[in-house]
């Protein structure tokens, strides 16, 4: 199956491209990027494909069956919609879009075209996350009444002044960049419960004085002090569902010293703490004694799992848990948190 990668930045090189290269049924025909040197560098690094600048050239090729959209958030909807209408199957990196309205338009076009539109919520292909989901589905934790997600860093604002910190491009900050993963894990593991109300507050504090922002390292590029910083660097929220209450506390940067990145699933029979990107611990009691253990199992690369499943679903027609229909609720929740923060009130979802 001939595929193309649109956007040849960090996530493309770290995840999408190597995973396609490792899939025997995939052949990368195009590397596309608006910066010609990036596309050409990919051709030279991986020894295959053709470098192009305009993604419309990719979509015009009838041999291309699937594309990965790995661009900045602001063009996720446009490129994905154009690709769907050109008859291509799409894996669009997270977040699907900057706003819930944009995500709805993507979903609408997917329904019209019938082509695949999956979103890069890669943790749905994480073996650790899927084992937690099985614990919950099998009733091992009993009634899950509360889930808390913490995605807090001491100093981790990406590319200060660049695309990540410009609302017109990214759509938001810590919530839309990191929170999307945590909220998606919670919803997935808990069976995608219906959301009733959302309350939240987003803060832009540590990065607003860009030249005064102290840090030890900065991913996504060096600071651009003549750039823009108008997104949230921290966020808090509470989401009431027909299942558990979900609370969240996230930050690219806070004065906390140590990073705190985990999810606590709290049930009346047991609990689980997932250390993000790592293993998890199960807490319970048995025969009057408290128990605590870490399951031991083989962890496969979740990005490889994601790409393999994407290729397979195109061939078989199987609908994946990362399909736009399933994950669009995350876009709605994030939008509601931002709306709640701006309006200073609780948001009710229909």
Label each PLM-derived region with a short phrase.
Residues 12, 92, 117-119, 248, ...:
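Hydrophobic residues in well-ordered beta-strands that form the structural core
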Residues 184-279, 307-318:
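Contiguous beta-strand/loop segments that form the cofactor/metal-binding neighborhood of enzyme cores
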Residues 11, 123-228, 344:
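Predominantly a Rossmann-like dinucleotide-binding segment in NAD(P)-dependent oxidoreductases
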Residues 11, 274, 296-308:
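Active-site loop of classical SDR/Rossmann-like NAD(P)-dependent oxidoreductases
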Residues 48-55:
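Conserved SAM-binding strand-loop segment of SAM-dependent methyltransferases
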Residues 1-46:
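N-terminal Rossmann-like dinucleotide-binding module
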Residues 26, 66-68, 104, 112-115, ...:
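C-terminal helix-rich "cap/oligomerization" subdomain common to oxidoreductases
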Residues 66, 72-73, 77-124, 139:
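Beta-strand-loop-alpha-helix segment that lines the small-molecule cofactor/substrate pocket
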């Amino acid at each position: 199956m001939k595929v193309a990668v649109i956007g040849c930045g960090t996530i493309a090189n770290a995840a999408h491209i190597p995973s396609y290269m490792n899939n025997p049924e995939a052949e990368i025909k195009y590397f596309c990027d608006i910066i010609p040197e990036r596309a050409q560098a990919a051709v030279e690094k991986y020894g295959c494909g053709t470098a192009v600048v305009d993604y419309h050239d990719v979509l015009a090729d009838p041999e291309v069956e699937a594309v990965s959209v790995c661009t900045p958030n602001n063009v996720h909807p446009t490129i994905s919609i154009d690709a769907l209408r050109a008859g291509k199957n799409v894996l669009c990196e997270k977040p699907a879009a900057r706003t819930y309205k944009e995500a709805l338009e993507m979903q609408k076009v997917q329904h019209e075209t019938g082509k695949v539109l999956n979103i890069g919520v890669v943790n749905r292909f994480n073996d650790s996350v899927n084992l937690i989901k099985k614990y919950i589905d099998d009733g091992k934790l009993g009634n899950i009444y509360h889930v808390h997600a913490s995605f807090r860093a001491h100093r981790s604002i990406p590319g200060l002044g660049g695309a990540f910190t410009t609302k017109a491009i990214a759509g938001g900050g810590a919530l839309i960049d990191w929170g999307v993963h945590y909220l998606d894990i919670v919803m997935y593991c808990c069976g995608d419960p219906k959301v009733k109300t959302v309350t939240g507050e987003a803060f832009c504090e540590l990065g607003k004085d860009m030249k005064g922002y102290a840090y030890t390292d900065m991913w996504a590029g060096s600071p651009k002090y003549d750039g823009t910083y108008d997104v949230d660097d921290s966020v808090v929220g509470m989401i009431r569902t027909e299942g558990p209450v979900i609370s969240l506390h996230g930050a690219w940067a806070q004065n906390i010293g140590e990073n705190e990145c985990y999810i606590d699933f709290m049930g009346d029979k047991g609990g689980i703490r997932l250390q993000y990107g790592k293993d998890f611990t199960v807490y319970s009691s048995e025969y009057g004694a408290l128990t605590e253990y870490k399951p031991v199992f083989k962890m496969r690369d979740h990005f490889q799992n994601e790409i393999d499943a994407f290729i397979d679903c195109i061939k078989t027609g199987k609908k994946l848990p990362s399909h736009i229909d399933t994950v669009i609720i995350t876009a709605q929740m994030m939008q509601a948190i931002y709306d709640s923060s701006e309006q200073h009130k609780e948001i009710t979802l229909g």
